[in-house]
Curated annotation (Swiss-Prot):
Keywords: ATP-binding, Hydrolase, Nucleotide-binding. Its EC number is 3.5.2.9. It catalyses: 5-oxo-L-proline + ATP + 2 H2O = L-glutamate + ADP + phosphate + H(+). One of its GO terms (molecular function) is ATP binding. It comes from the Bacteria. The lineage of its organism: Bacteria, Pseudomonadati, Pseudomonadota, Gammaproteobacteria, Pseudomonadales. This is 5-oxoprolinase subunit A 3. GO terms for biological process: carbohydrate metabolic process.
Length: 256
């Protein structure tokens, strides 16, 4: 039986500003990418999300970002390597402290937004993130875009790295994500999304935006928690995968 992880970006509300339905998503996903305060989230809200995740036995990951709350972490930044390393260490460490208080622990790191996309191809910034993880906890798993050069780079530097696919994003024929600035980049139909991901899990391929089939090898599937139909989409995806006898389990298990 093929096993796959379902993850979502959570803990992104800030003060009076609400983002997503964390409680509902935690009933569906197996891993939670929790904001660390740089692109979204505040300490009290992050702690609430961590406690809720612990109660549901959902695995926790640090959703690290560029320091960009105004742009929700989606603006490219040319950050110096030492600054980026320090920023990532700071975010992981902060989340580790809150997670301990919530009775859980951080098991992996998934960069957010522009940082995620940049380190998929930018070796300098990728190494800065890798150095941060090695410095604070080399046992943390790094989540990377399926097909990116980051996967082999991280593994060559001694980290465990897993590949991720996106349920609600369109793909180019080259296997990269279609830019959010392009029409059709974000998918909203729960049934369509679920069938696309079922094909991915069963055959290792996905239909690109031009109709061609692209090979994608992934250990985890992300459903963005901030999309309008996020909960409905995640629920339908889980239903379809379970109906097809797919085992849903976190890629980063508990440490012995």
């Amino acid at each position: 039986m093929r096993a796959i992880d379902l993850n979502s970006d959570l803990g992104e509300s800030f003060g009076a500003w609400s983002m997503g339905d964390d409680a509902a998503m935690l009933d569906i996903v197996t891993s939670a990418n929790v904001a660390c305060g740089f692109h979204a989230g505040d300490p009290a809200g992050i702690l609430r999300t961590l406690k809720a995740a612990a109660a549901k036995n959902v695995t926790i990951g640090a959703h690290v970002s560029y320091p960009d709350k105004v742009g929700f972490g989606r603006r490219n930044m040319d950050v110096a390597s030492d600054e980026l390393t320090a920023d990532v260490i700071y975010q992981i460490g902060s989340l580790q402290g809150l997670a301990k208080a919530a009775g859980t622990s951080v098991r992996y790191v998934k960069p957010h937004g522009a940082l995620y996309n940049t380190i998929a191809h930018d070796r300098r910034q990728a190494m800065a993130v890798i150095e941060a993880i090695r410095a604070i906890d080399p046992a943390l798993v790094l989540v990377a875009l399926a097909g990116s050069t980051l996967i082999e780079l991280a593994r060559s530097e001694g980290l465990q790295c897993i590949a991720e696919a996106f349920a609600d994003r369109a793909y180019t024929p080259q296997g990269t994500l279609v830019s959010r600035r392009e029409p059709g980049a974000v998918l909203h139909d729960p049934e369509l999304v679920a069938q696309r991901m079922l094909r991915l899990v069963q055959s290792g391929s996905i239909e690109a935006i031009d109709g061609s089939l692209v090979r994608i090898e992934a250990d985890s599937i992300c459903v963005h928690g901030d999309s309008p139909a996020a909960v409905e989409m995640a629920r339908e995806l889980r239903r379809v995968l379970e109906q097809a006898s797919t085992s849903l389990q976190p890629f980063a298990g508990k440490r012995s």
